[in-house]
Amino acid sequence: ASSMRLIFGGNPGETMFTTSDIGWVVGHSYIIYGPLINGMATIMYEGTPLRPDAGIWWSLVEKYKVSVMFSAPTAVRVLKKQDPAFLSKYNLSTLRTLFLAGEPLDEPTASWIHGALKKPVVDNYWQTETGWPILAIQRGVEVMPHKFGSPGVPVYGYNMKLLDESTGAELGPDQKGVVAIEGPLPPGCMQTVWGDDQRFVKTYWETVPGKMVYSTFDWAIKDKD
């Protein structure tokens, strides 16, 4: 619930449009639970961003006065190939921010949709296992610029480490390593594997030599800033 205010900037009485499938964690967290707990209306949309035409999402933003939108880079890349008139024909004045997650957001895609919408485009990184963002820009906590090509900084509640997967050594800027989280995990994250606590520990917490840390199994490079 706190992420709705501190990360996504949603307010009670507003509308959120998350284009995810309800069978995926983003659908659970940000079509159902997050917006409704925060007193927002939510749009549940079934279909592609191209049917009946490439303006369908933007028509919903206009019709329901969407303030916060959450989608995926792949969907934006699909829309980038379409006639730009489908985007410009709708009134998107209520939309404050477009959030994107689910895969790496490349700079050309981010720059294109930012220029087309003339709205902030904010990346964020997380997993099914965490249920909410791990890395993000948290304007409800601290005002900071976002940088295309980066999902942001560690979210409150996460003690993030970038580690050498072979030695467990902590890495510095411009070094590639595995993204890890020191325990305890914050509320919202998985607590075990159903009926098999040992599998949970062995799979997620015992993969980095000499460290009892949660491994995301994802790789990253930390910027100097």
Question: Residue spans of the language-model regions?
Answer:
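Short Gly/Pro-enriched turn/cap motifs at secondary-structure boundaries
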Residues: K147-P154, E170, T203-M212
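Conserved ATP-binding/catalytic segment of the ANL
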Residues: D174, A180-D225
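Active-site phosphate/pyrophosphate- and oxyanion-stabilizing loops and adjacent acidic/basic residues
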Residues: S2, S111, G149
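Active-site glycine-centered loops adjacent to acidic/histidine catalytic or metal-binding residues
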Residues: D21, G102, W126, G152, ...
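Gly/Ser/Thr-rich phosphate-binding loop
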Residues: N11-M16, Y33, I37-M40, S67-S71, ...
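Conserved AMP-binding/adenylation subdomain of ANL enzymes
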Residues: A1-T15, V25-S67, K81-Q82
